[in-house]
């Protein structure tokens, strides 16, 4: 309902051909599970501490503001989110950022960076280390898009 109502209001208030992507995460303390609903946003990265792997989950859905009603396009999915696991959210400016040679940072590099730094780390240390990898990759190249990175962890 949140994305459906947000889309309805946004569609009425923004200029044609404008839109917004998003992903909505919801933690259910009763069943100890994380749920997400996509609004055409980037993948969600989930680092599974037990397996020491990082998984990219497509968020699905459609960007908000593109069509008047997204009721039939909104679907809530579940994320496996065990104690010690991380969820990483990011904007497309993070993966599409280019270095001086024009090469994009990309999803594969972002996943690898999370995998490398998550083991035994905290959300703060993972954020700092991934940000450092990103900064070293892009160097002095000016970026034209926003670069957003959010890291959260389910406590042990």
What kind of feature is each model-predicted range?
Residues 1-156:
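Conserved subregion of the PPM/PP2C metallophosphatase catalytic domain
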């Amino acid at each position: 309902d949140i994305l459906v109502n947000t889309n309805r209001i946004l569609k009425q208030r923004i200029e044609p051909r404008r839109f917004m992507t998003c992903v909505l995460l919801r933690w259910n303390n009763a069943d100890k599970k994380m749920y997400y609903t996509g609004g055409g946003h980037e993948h969600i990265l989930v680092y599974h501490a037990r397996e020491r792997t990082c998984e990219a989950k497509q968020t699905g859905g459609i960007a908000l503001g593109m069509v008047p009603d997204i009721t039939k396009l909104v679907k809530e999915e579940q994320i496996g989110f065990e104690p010690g696991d991380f969820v990483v959210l990011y904007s497309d400016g993070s993966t599409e950022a280019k270095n001086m040679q024009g090469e994009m940072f990309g999803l594969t590099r972002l996943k690898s960076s999370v995998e490398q730094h998550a083991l035994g780390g905290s959300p703060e240390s993972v954020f700092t280390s991934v940000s450092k990898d990103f900064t070293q990759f892009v160097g002095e190249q000016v970026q034209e898009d926003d670069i957003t990175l959010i890291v959260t962890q389910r406590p042990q």
